[in-house]
């Protein structure tokens, strides 16, 4: 990330020395126990999707906290890992909206310009949200602010109350915000199912003269 557009623009949004603070945090927590995702995948979202390519942002809360699940991409798991409940519901809504995606791995979305960003980028094994509020929010808020400043239209997909709180970071009127209940089994029937975020995203992109996302890839 160090020589990327991401690095330069995120750095401008953060206090002096914040990257060093993050590296110190990572050194400490990875030395102290099992942390997900693997350290080399902590920044996978911005390493896979260049800033210039971002057309869509799907914001999650924090990584999966079970073995071999987290890849550094929100909601995604490797294909040899069963889809967790929220991802099952995302794929169910996708099937109802556009068609069936066979893969649980969402890397193909990231490679097409879908920034799969979690607000927190690390989690201890078995302890959801344990790193919330420690270091990540200023960093990931900075990423959202950087995307907000893009001159090209972007779709921000915000699922659930946590993600929807980030609306105040999205001030550019040319962007589209799609929001609904979270795909979690606890809330999916309260407005996530039937919200058609995938076709709505593509309709917007096409209307703006941009390539739609192949959500089934």
Curated annotation (Swiss-Prot):
The EC number(s) attached to this protein equal 3.2.2.27
Q: Supply the Pfam families for this chain.
A: UDG
Which catalytic reaction applies to this protein?
A: Hydrolyzes single-stranded DNA or mismatched double-stranded DNA and polynucleotides, releasing free uracil
Catalytic-site annotation from UniProt: 62
Cited CDD domains: UDG-F1-like
Q: Which GO terms describe its molecular function?
A: uracil DNA N-glycosylase activity
Q: Which GO terms describe its cellular component?
A: cytoplasm
Q: Which GO terms describe its biological process?
A: base-excision repair, AP site formation via deaminated base removal
- Give compartment(s): Cytoplasm
Provide this UniProt record's keywords sorted from A to Z.
Answer: Cytoplasm, DNA damage, DNA repair, Hydrolase
Q: Which domain of life is it from?
A: Bacteria
Q: What class of enzyme is it?
A: hydrolase
What does the protein in this record do? Excises uracil residues from the DNA which can arise as a result of misincorporation of dUMP residues by DNA polymerase or due to deamination of cytosine.
Q: Per the similarity annotation, which family is this?
A: Belongs to the uracil-DNA glycosylase (UDG) superfamily. UNG family.
Q: What is this protein called?
A: Uracil-DNA glycosylase
This chain's source organism reads: Streptococcus gordonii (strain Challis / ATCC 35105 / BCRC 15272 / CH1 / DL1 / V288)
Q: Lineage in the entry?
A: Bacteria, Bacillati, Bacillota, Bacilli, Lactobacillales
């Amino acid at each position: 990330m160090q020589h990327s557009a991401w690095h330069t623009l995120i750095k401008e949004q953060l206090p002096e020395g914040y990257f060093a603070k993050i590296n110190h945090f990572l050194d400490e927590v990875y030395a102290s126990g099992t942390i997900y995702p693997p350290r080399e995948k902590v920044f996978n979202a911005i390493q896979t999707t260049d800033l210039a390519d971002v057309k869509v942002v799907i914001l999650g809360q924090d990584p999966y906290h079970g073995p071999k699940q987290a890849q550094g991409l929100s909601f995604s798991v490797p294909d040899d890992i069963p889809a967790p409940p929220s991802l099952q519901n995302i794929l169910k809504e996708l099937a109802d909206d556009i068609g069936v995606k066979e893969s649980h791995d969402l890397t193909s979305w990231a490679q097409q310009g879908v920034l799969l960003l979690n607000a927190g980028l690390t989690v201890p094994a078995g302890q959801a949200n344990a790193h919330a509020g420690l270091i990540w929010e200023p960093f990931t808020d900075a990423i959202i602010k950087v995307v907000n400043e893009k001159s090209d239209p972007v779709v921000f997909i915000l699922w659930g109350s946590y993600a929807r709180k980030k609306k105040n970071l999205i001030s550019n009127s040319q962007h589209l915000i799609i929001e609904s209940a979270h795909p979690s089994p606890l809330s999916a029937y309260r407005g996530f199912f039937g919200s058609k975020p995938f076709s709505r995203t593509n309709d917007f992109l096409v209307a703006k003269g941009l390539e739609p996302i192949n959500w089934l890839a």
